[in-house]
């Protein structure tokens, strides 16, 4: 799901505490937020707990919080901070070498490009993304799958925009290198 498709109007939640809109927001963002939290805390169960804590806190403090301009960015930043606090409270340091135990399937509407890419190629692409170093993979997913700008990803991860740019270059080179034999075979 791209940033524009996620940027639904959640103002009635922030203004009125609309439970239905809150549930819609949770449903729309939870899979991506769990995936992101898992990249920080290192396992699915803790990631689920972190995301639940964020949504509980948002619900409890809805009347006191100013509605954010960018709900997606706000939620990712809240998950990042909650995950880091979770690690600190549990006597663990953040590790970017943690294995991601969860795969979140992003439901994309089919378009002509999706139809042309067969299942085997999608498996190769997913394997290439998963083989990236953890920080590089995290940046790639935020930018390419979640639709964050380089600047937003840099701010969210407390990195420079140049670092995000370098990591994206590395990610794309590694993915293309991994896919090279597959693409040559498929289209020759």
Regions found by a protein language model. Name each.
Residues 1-32, 39, 188:
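N-terminal module of bacterial RNA polymerase sigma factors
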Residues 130, 134, 138, 146-163:
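Helix-turn-helix DNA-binding module
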Residues 15, 55-70, 89-91:
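Sigma70-family region 2
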Residues 35, 49-56, 69-81:
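Structural recognition of an alpha-helix C-terminal capping motif at a helix-to-coil junction
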Residues 2-4, 12-13, 94-97, 155-156, ...:
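C-terminal edge and immediately downstream basic/flexible tail or linker adjoining helix-turn-helix-like DNA-binding
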Residues 3-6, 93-118:
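Internal acidic/polar
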Residues 80-97:
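Arg/Lys-rich amphipathic alpha helix in sigma70-family domain 2
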Residues 26-44, 61, 129:
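Amphipathic, Lys/Arg- and hydrophobic-enriched alpha-helical face
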């Amino acid at each position: 799901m791209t940033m524009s498709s996620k940027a639904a109007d959640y103002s009635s939640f922030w203004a009125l505490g609309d439970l239905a809109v809150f549930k819609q927001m949770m449903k729309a963002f939870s899979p991506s937020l769990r995936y992101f939290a898992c990249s920080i805390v290192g396992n699915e169960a803790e990631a689920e707990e972190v995301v639940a804590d964020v949504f509980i806190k948002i619900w409890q403090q809805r009347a006191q919080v100013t509605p954010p301009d960018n709900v997606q960015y706000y939620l990712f930043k809240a998950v990042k901070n909650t995950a880091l606090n979770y690690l600190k409270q549990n006597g663990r340091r953040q590790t970017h070498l943690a294995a991601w135990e969860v795969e979140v399937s992003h439901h994309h509407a089919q378009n002509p490009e999706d139809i042309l890419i067969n299942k085997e190629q999608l498996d190769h692409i997913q394997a290439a993304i998963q083989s990236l170093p953890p920080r590089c993979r995290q940046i790639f997913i935020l930018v390419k799958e979640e639709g964050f700008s380089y600047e937003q990803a840099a701010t969210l991860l407390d990195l420079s925009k140049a670092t995000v740019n370098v990591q994206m270059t590395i990610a794309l080179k590694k993915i293309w290198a991994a896919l090279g034999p597959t693409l040559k075979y498929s289209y020759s």
